[in-house]
Amino acid sequence: MNINPYFLFIDVPIQAAISTTFPYTGVPPYSHGTGTGYTIDTVIRTHEYSNKGKQYISDVTGCAMVDPTNGPLPEDNEPSAYAQLDCVLEALDRMDEEHPGLFQAASQNAMEALMVTTVDKLTQGRQTFDWTVCRNQPAATALNTTITSFRLNDLNGADKGGLVPFCQDIIDSLDKPEMTFFSVKNIKKKLPAKNRKGFLIKRIPMKVKDRITRVEYIKRALSLNTMTKDAERGKLKRRAIATAGIQIRGFVLVVENLAKNICENLEQSGLPVGGNEKKAKLSNAVAKMLSNCPPGGISMTVTGDNTKWNECLNPRIFLAMTERITRDSPIWFRDFCSIAPVLFSNKIARLGKGFMITSKTKRLKAQIPCPDLFNIPLERYNEETRAKLKKLKPFFNEEGTASLSPGMMMGMFNMLSTVLGVAALGIKNIGNREYLWDGLQSSDDFALFVNAKDEETCMEGINDFYRTCKLLGINMSKKKSYCNETGMFEFTSMFYRDGFVSNFAMELPSFGVAGVNESADMAIGMTIIKNNMINNGMGPATAQTAIQLFIADYRYTYKCHRGDSKVEGKRMKIIKELWENTKGRDGLLVADGGPNIYNLRNLHIPEIVLKYNLMDPEYKGRLLHPQNPFVGHLSIEGIKEADITPAHGPIKKMDYDAVSGTHSWRTKRNRSILNTDQRNMILEEQCYAKCCNLFEACFNSASYRKPVGQHSMLEAMAHRLRMDARLDYESGRMSKDDFEKAMAHLGEIGHI
């Protein structure tokens, strides 16, 4: 049956008509081809905003550097990055006065957390630039290659288990005259072809030792790899994002943790909270502003937009901020916190794959890798690219990278930049004029509230705020920010009008079928609808329609229409046969051609549980048979997580309940990867998985604790098994003979 999607809005209050204005249903745009152009754009723009700063050449890397701090004050409304350090420090002093003890407490907590953080913290995170192979790898792999390569250079800090000794190794590695590391080289072998004349050339990946000089190593350690940001809606042009290497990650982690401790205690910060907690914080801020409004006065709200937030910020400001925040901390911790901003102010951007050019006859295409961009005549590029390359020239390094000292890349210091934004909001007033401002800040997004006796004074306040921000290197966009009376604004895609407007249109893209497997998809679909009823004000009629839409979508995706429907097809043939031979047809899962019995009352129950008592015994036996090879019991234990992609903002993790049945299959990975140099990675992964399974067999999950101390996994397991064996022997569950055998085995293992 066809359902009109506008039924989704049957019982929604009028303000929520905002939901109808989001045309975000289809697939978002993905990038393809080279991202080099976007990265070069970022490099050029960032330098343009800072071009009146101090220019010099780095003693270490030989790169062209620009320092815009304390640069000339702007004379127009164009974006500029000339933050005045004394203004930044004064804003932080005011924050310190308003929140006595906050900086000390945050520093103390961050320091204590750092002392107990282990190296494995760095395995969290997605792609990481791996300096040994000069491309992105999963975070755990990049950490592993770094640690194994460090060992070749007598840097064994990681073996102590803590993050601090590993970070000490990173600092030491920057001073080594040369670094040895493992890289992967393809060795070509000529083999006679079996089925025809001639030879086959076979590539065999080999792990080889390689070495690079100090300068080359430092350049790699400071490199950020760049990609194009995917799935960004509502923009014509794509933009570049960056991935830092493992050397930078450990230091950034600590600074961000420090900033997070501060943000948690600032009422103006929209981070690190989210969801309903964030809404409560916002509502409080609005109520507070309205209650502070002078009698007969007016309260205005600016829905703010900052121009190029990241590109106008500067690592040197962040250095000043960490120094100020950690003022009362031990010197070693202050030094530790200063490393991330220092590394960032010397960062180098890798430019990606390079450009494609075509021959004059348009017959041949060639990819020009980044190191060779300037080795071919500029006339060969189109006009747009030619203009870009001319501007890039002063900052280009011969390895095909670009020096990028000013500016921050996307997503690197979200928390610390939020602290800077809140510092601007916390000033409240300049020169005791007759207005007061306050607001909310979440990374680059802000909302500004201004109270005053009349509209003109409010405007005066907004202009003063604009100028204050300029002094901190923040550029509020006059074109894109708009002002209303308080009570109606938007902040981080939450629309406020006398309360938060329900806006589930943002979630519409995630209402589809997730594509994990039939069992998980049903659970995820229902959980999303349930969550939207709880969090986004989705009404009952709407939810009922959403269930029907989802079931229709699910049946089309998995070609599992009802057994009594007229749909033809390979799978339908089997489903119809099952339908004919089943007595309790209500007990068939939707994936097996059964009816849908979900409604608003039972959304939270997994389908197998819901239909359990309606199933035929034979069907139930097949569906849930533990020996059935399709019942993936290991992969599902209680709660699972899925990645959900809303129309805006980052991918969200979502928990759902799942019961394991024959529909909980897991897909096999792509086989073509087995012939590449990543094969070693897969073999290592499998080895780790086996180790972890063995460890879990020794320690049941109830006895997991964060590892403290210097035991290896092997010693811990041997120790645990000895204890278990002794308990079994003493209680009579184990014979003397078996006990002695077990102890002998463990004795051998313990000495490997």
Swiss-Prot record:
Ranges where the record places region Promoter-binding site: 249-256
EC number: 2.7.7.48
Entry-linked InterPro entries: RNA-dir_pol_NSvirus (IPR007099), RNA_pol_PB1_influenza (IPR001407)
GO cellular component annotations of the record: host cell cytoplasm; host cell nucleus
Post-translational modifications: Phosphorylated by host PRKCA.
Catalytic reactions on record: RNA(n) + a ribonucleoside 5'-triphosphate = RNA(n+1) + diphosphate
The organism's place on the tree of life at top rank: Viruses
Alphabetized Pfam families for the sequence: Flu_PB1 (PF00602)
Motif (Nuclear localization signal): 187-195, 203-216
Gene Ontology molecular function: any one: RNA-directed RNA polymerase activity
Gene3D superfamilies, alphabetized: 6.10.140.720
UniProt main location, coarse: host cell
Domain RdRp catalytic: 286-482
Compartment(s) where it occurs, according to its Swiss-Prot or TrEMBL record: Host nucleus; Host cytoplasm
Any one Gene Ontology BP term: symbiont-mediated suppression of host mRNA transcription via inhibition of RNA polymerase II activity
Keywords, in A-Z order: Eukaryotic host gene expression shutoff by virus, Eukaryotic host transcription shutoff by virus, Host cytoplasm, Host gene expression shutoff by virus, Host nucleus, Host-virus interaction, Inhibition of host RNA polymerase II by virus, Nucleotide-binding, Nucleotidyltransferase, Phosphoprotein, RNA-directed RNA polymerase, Transferase, Viral RNA replication, Viral transcription
Family annotation (HAMAP family): INFV_RDRP
Role according to the record: RNA-dependent RNA polymerase which is responsible for replication and transcription of virus RNA segments. The transcription of viral mRNAs occurs by a unique mechanism called cap-snatching. 5' methylated caps of cellular mRNAs are cleaved after 10-13 nucleotides by PA. In turn, these short capped RNAs are used as primers by PB1 for transcription of viral mRNAs. During virus replication, PB1 initiates RNA synthesis and copy vRNA into complementary RNA (cRNA) which in turn serves as a template for the production of more vRNAs.
Family stated for the protein in its record: Belongs to the influenza viruses polymerase PB1 family.
Description of how the protein assembles with itself and partners: Influenza RNA polymerase is composed of three subunits: PB1, PB2 and PA. Interacts (via N-terminus) with PA (via C-terminus). Interacts (via C-terminus) with PB2 (via N-terminus); this interaction is essential for transcription initiation.
Annotated protein name in UniProt: RNA-directed RNA polymerase catalytic subunit
Native organism: Influenza B virus (strain B/Ann Arbor/1/1966 [wild-type])
Gene name per UniProt: PB1
